[in-house]
Amino acid sequence: MSSTKDELQLYAKAIYNCAISNHQSLDHWKTMLQLMANILNNEIIKNLISKAYFSQHVISLFIDLCCNKVNQYGINLIKILAENKRLMLLEKLYKEFINLCELYQGVVNITVISAHKLNEEYISKINIMLKKRFFKKINVTYVIDESIIGGLIIKFCDTVINASIHSRLEKLLNILQY
């Protein structure tokens, strides 16, 4: 796991714990983080934050752009992220926070990648198998990627199950090279 992913998980968990311990709505935190990420997506703001002359004035501008929709805890988060030069991670932090909330609420997000569109019967079998595996509510997203040639890739949390033809061919190629 990369250090950025570790950092994101730590920040997300800290936000989650802050919300719970201060009796704050998780939905309010989702809204605040989404607002912050949306503001950061503005090219002018992004350029200001990424420049070497990033200052307290830029932090104040960023907070002002939140239009009083961010509480004191959110403002403190902005200051901490800015102090640690991590404001650019806000969009990823927002996504990580949502994943963490869903995980604590017993929801697992799963991505199933196939080379072609799957029929309803096959999708039903995959859903049943995944529900048995996780014993939780699951949200399954199906993605088509023709480059995998055939088979499936299943992604959830930090786990990837790669049962694609493409990966098998790569393994075979590596074996043959030695």
UniProtKB/Swiss-Prot annotation:
Its main location: membrane. The keyword rRNA-binding does not apply. InterPro entries: ATP_synth_OSCP/delta_N_sf, ATPase_OSCP/dsu. It is found in: Cell membrane. It comes from the Bacteria. GO terms for molecular function: proton-transporting ATP synthase activity, rotational mechanism. Pfam families: OSCP. GO terms for cellular component: plasma membrane; proton-transporting ATP synthase complex. It is a peripheral membrane protein. Keywords: ATP synthesis, Cell membrane, CF(1), Hydrogen ion transport, Ion transport, Membrane, Transport. F-type ATPases have 2 components, F(1) - the catalytic core - and F(0) - the membrane proton channel. F(1) has five subunits: alpha(3), beta(3), gamma(1), delta(1), epsilon(1). F(0) has three main subunits: a(1), b(2) and c(10-14). The alpha and beta chains form an alternating ring which encloses part of the gamma chain. F(1) is attached to F(0) by a central stalk formed by the gamma and epsilon chains, while a peripheral stalk is formed by the delta and b chains. F(1)F(0) ATP synthase produces ATP from ADP in the presence of a proton or sodium gradient. F-type ATPases consist of two structural domains, F(1) containing the extramembraneous catalytic core and F(0) containing the membrane proton channel, linked together by a central stalk and a peripheral stalk. During catalysis, ATP synthesis in the catalytic domain of F(1) is coupled via a rotary mechanism of the central stalk subunits to proton translocation. This protein is part of the stalk that links CF(0) to CF(1). It either transmits conformational changes from CF(0) to CF(1) or is implicated in proton conduction. This is ATP synthase subunit delta.
